[in-house]
């Protein structure tokens, strides 16, 4: 990604004239979310400036704040930065390097819909096929069964050695989790519990947290309508610049 970003925060890379982060903020606003916390790593002052200008603007959430994840320690650790911001409410998590196009409904709204119906933690899932695997990141395959828009996840494999892109593991297609979630307020305590079980120095990722949710029967998948674009990869970013138009 450095070959494209060239020192720019990747969250601010332009797609159809707007930063990647802006597309996700607009998606949140279209989904009815008025309060957003953007978690950033140290030294990304440009993101803070962008957020200050964007908050309350046309098509943007009314309140957008930033908080710093002091060191890169995994997605679950980044989620935990938002504990005080979320209070005792469920929290939506949307990763800016995952975009969705050609959907009848924003991806954030879709996972919220499934949460409202199931009252469970929700992870967005999508189908990966051979023609797009090389432009999607190396997330694990989720075995399970689809029921309408729901996806009953059988298991979530732990992260092991992997390449730089998605592996179908010989299958013609496979389901995987992508960067749209709803977590119940209890997820923050669960993240703390999972952290205590990790080996020293091990990253506090979302996978072991969702594995614990699945074991407790409190996690469900939502099959997301629309085309998933992984702009965290150069190939995915180029695809997104060709397909995304400002709405």
Q: PLM features: what roles do these ranges have?
A:
Residues 1-5:
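A phosphate-binding catalytic loop at a beta-strand-loop-alpha-helix junction
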Residues 11, 63-65, 152, 218-220:
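Conserved beta-strand segments of alpha/beta enzyme cores
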Residues 13-14, 18-93, 99-104:
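Conserved N-terminal catalytic core of the sugar/cofactor nucleotidyltransferase
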Residues 38, 93, 123-124, 221:
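Structural beta-sheet core signal
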Residues 54-61, 114, 145-148, 211-214:
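Short, conserved catalytic or adaptor-binding loops enriched in Gly and charged residues
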Residues 67-69, 124-125, 159, 222-224:
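Conserved beta-strand termini and adjacent loop/short-helix elements that scaffold enzyme active sites
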Residues 101-189, 193:
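Conserved core of the sugar-phosphate nucleotidyltransferase
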Residues 156, 165, 172-247:
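Conserved alpha/beta core of the MobA/IspD/sugar-nucleotide pyrophosphorylase nucleotidyltransferase superfamily
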